[in-house]
Amino acid sequence: MDQAKQDELKKAAAKKAAALVEDGMVLGVGTGSTVKFFIDELGKKKAAGLTLKAVVTTSSRSQKQLEGYGFTVSPLSEVDQVDLTVDGADRVDKQLNGIKGGGAALTLEKNVAVNSKKNVWIVDESKVVDHLSGFALPVEVLPISCMQVEKRLADEGLKPEFRLTEDGQRLKTHYGNYILDLKLDRIPVPSGLADYLDHTVGVVEHGLFLNICDQVIIARDNGEIEVRSR
């Protein structure tokens, strides 16, 4: 499929997600190529009179785009709860569980998501899988114990690798931590791995988003827009 056709599908999915946004909401906005089109749709709705109580976002790129449309972006700490968050995902399975954090913003993404009444992901068909696989699982770790965590994960057969910058340095997250990418072919029991990582000292957060997403809007290659709900 050529890029122009793929973009048209993403725009259609973004428009469907934008239809869920209502006046007076506290809205969470993620990042990614499809979310970019969602923000464009928000801009149209704002021009038509949409008013939001607050907007929070998970990336500086989305913040800049939102502000370009006249939205004021607030930090998560300044809102009690988010009514709706629209974001992308790196992978999503049949149970609407997903892998996120390819952009290294997993800690903020998960904090926004778990503090949202409803989470909607918009993705293209390439992100949809039967079982979580085909994408490295990011794990954010504290620098002070990163080597110990790496060894512990390696001993468990989880194949950790430090994510590096273009010049070969360890990539630092917004919070000054490192990312270990788990190069797993497949995650057979996501809940078990999530529980293990949750209880590993030195792990700040991981990219398994389980029982968080309420609805996925999928741009299919055949031109259809599919909606799956939990």
Swiss-Prot record:
Catalytic activity: aldehydo-D-ribose 5-phosphate = D-ribulose 5-phosphate
Top-level taxon: Bacteria
Pathway membership, UniProt: Carbohydrate degradation; pentose phosphate pathway; D-ribose 5-phosphate from D-ribulose 5-phosphate (non-oxidative stage): step 1/1
Keywords linked to the UniProt accession: Isomerase
InterPro entries linked to this entry: NagB/RpiA_transferase-like, Ribose5P_isomerase_typA_subgr, Ribose5P_isomerase_type_A
Residues given in the record as substrate binding sites: 31-34, 87-90, 100-103, 127
CDD domains per the UniProt record, alphabetical: RPI_A
Gene Ontology molecular function: any one: ribose-5-phosphate isomerase activity
GO (cellular component) term, any one: cytosol
GO biological process, one term: D-ribose metabolic process
Xref: NCBIfam families: PRK00702.1, rpiA
Record family assignment: Belongs to the ribose 5-phosphate isomerase family.
Function, in words: Catalyzes the reversible conversion of ribose-5-phosphate to ribulose 5-phosphate.
Protein name per UniProt: Ribose-5-phosphate isomerase A
Name of the gene encoding the protein in the UniProt record: rpiA
